[in-house]
Regions:
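Beta-rich carbohydrate-recognition modules and glycan-binding surfaces
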Residues: 1-167
Length: 167
């Protein structure tokens, strides 16, 4: 069964998403999640390595995004050839453990990326957290998109929806 978390077909769909870029560490990368009148959102910006930077992200405001028995997260996206991460947080805090998985959508075409629950790994500021508990999808409070991993320059990921697949 599939359950929709975010449908980006309307302008108000992006209002709960905020940029969190490497400026928190002195960097100058920029990003935003904006609405495209074609009926989807666009995660766009520029990653810069200046001032020890190197990542850009957007995150939704905390809310009840938890679902039981999740087997995968589904993203319908139009890629630009770059690698991205989906971040999940199980609390309302700004900083702390993130459960993340990388995805590499096909460039130039709409595709559905299926991100298996088992592939989400706990990390803190990009470093593994081996002693963190496994992801409990029923406790998810925040969802985010990120670009990092030494990918300098402009980026643009169009996104129609984020959903969950459950048993």
């Amino acid at each position: 069964m599939t359950s929709l978390l975010f449908d980006f077909s309307a302008p108000q769909s992006v209002t709960l998403w905020n940029p969190i870029n490497d400026g928190v560490m002195g960097g100058i990368s920029k990003s935003q999640l904006r609405y495209d009148p074609a009926g989807h959102a666009v995660f766009t910006g520029k990653v810069s390595f200046e001032n020890n930077g190197g990542f850009a992200s957007v995150r939704c405001q905390p809310g009840d995004l938890g679902r039981k028995d999740v087997t995968a997260y589904l993203l319908e996206v139009f890629g630009d050839g770059k690698r991205y991460k989906l971040n999940l947080r199980t609390d309302n805090s700004f900083d702390g453990v993130n459960y993340q998985v990388q995805f590499h959508p096909t460039a130039g075409t709409w595709t559905t990326c299926r991100l298996a629950r088992a592939d989400f790994l706990p990390s803190w500021r990009g470093k593994p957290v081996p002693d963190a508990p496994p992801l409990d999808t029923s406790r998810v409070r925040q969802i985010g998109l990120m670009i990092a991993d030494r990918q300098e320059g402009a980026f643009e990921l169009a996104i129609r929806l984020i959903a969950v697949e459950t048993v």
